[in-house]
Amino acid sequence: MIELLDKVRPSSSCLHVLFISYDGYTTNVPIEAVFSKQSLLATSLDGEPLPTKYGGPVRVVIPHLYAWKSAKYIKEIHFTDHLHLGYWEKRGYSNTADPWREERFIDKEVPGWRD
């Protein structure tokens, strides 16, 4: 991911990164998440192009956030200065998604989610 950021050079006003998948799935992460050395854009597996069943052609992997932030089938990446809620975030899931802080939902309990 660092190689991409070196080429793109997001502006200093960039606060968020929005990933858009071929299947319409979207997720947004804070810019700090993509600057993490743990984060990566996977394009291959064992020297071969990443198979669709594993999220190819491009999959973002951000292991220090909840799994819904690691989108598959990436077709677009937007660097933005404002928050765009992704698929799960529009449904009440946390935008920051830190599992160590148990940031699963925007509110600790989302009304109706157990129904």
Protein language model features and the residues they cover:
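Structured, non-membrane catalytic/scaffold regions adjacent to prosthetic-group chemistry
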Residues: 1-115
